[in-house]
Amino acid sequence: MKEILDSRFLLTHYGAKDEEVLSRTRTRLAALRRERRGVLPSIVIAEVANAICQEAGRAEALAKLRALEHAGFEVVQLDPELARDAGLLKCMHRDLPMADCVIAATALRLGGRVVSDDPHFSKVKGLRTTWI
């Protein structure tokens, strides 16, 4: 099953101070690469770039993004159909951030699950999630 990476998972990985958390995120990322099940919505790249840039600066953000881009995950671009599906999810779930709607729509389209502990996702019918 495809696993759609949410920004919260990647930011947990990049910001992990706890060795156990870092070990678990590394293990998950390695398995997703090895099994070619990892999916990276393009909106997540934007969210991660912004968060790391604000926290650690532009150079650090670019370094992390280069590593992420070379990790071999399938990058899903926001196309018109996905945008429509995300917009309709937003209409039904007004408190769900638009980026999360795009991530949820990606998971629903691919029949995958979102790697996140974000409680927003539990509101979307038929959406599966997993965490470290």
Residue map of PLM features:
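Anion (oxyanion) recognition and catalysis
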Residues: R33, E69, L108
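Short, well-structured N-terminal submotif of metal-dependent ribonuclease cores
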Residues: M1-L40, C53-R66
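Acidic, PIN/NYN-like endoribonuclease modules and their adjacent C-terminal/linker elements
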Residues: A104, L108-I132
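Histidine- and aromatic-rich ligand-binding microenvironments
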Residues: L5-D6, L40-S42, D95-P97, D118, ...
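Active-site neighborhoods of divalent-metal-dependent phosphate/nucleic-acid chemistry enzymes
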Residues: E74-V115
